[in-house]
């Protein structure tokens, strides 16, 4: 599966100092179906859980956005 980062996702990762390989590791270890998903994971080294929004179409995984989830839920692995 090919992983593509949107321009917005690249900017959020740079702003919040989230390494690209951290996001890729989380996504490679998940079984995701077609459609849009919200993923919340605890990541070592980050104060807050990391939220990643992705879309999967035709075996291409596009990261729409990613950021530390500072408010609300801290449940790991939430999928919508």
Regions of interest found by a model, annotated:
Residues 1-80:
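Ribonuclease/tRNase effector modules and their secretory precursors
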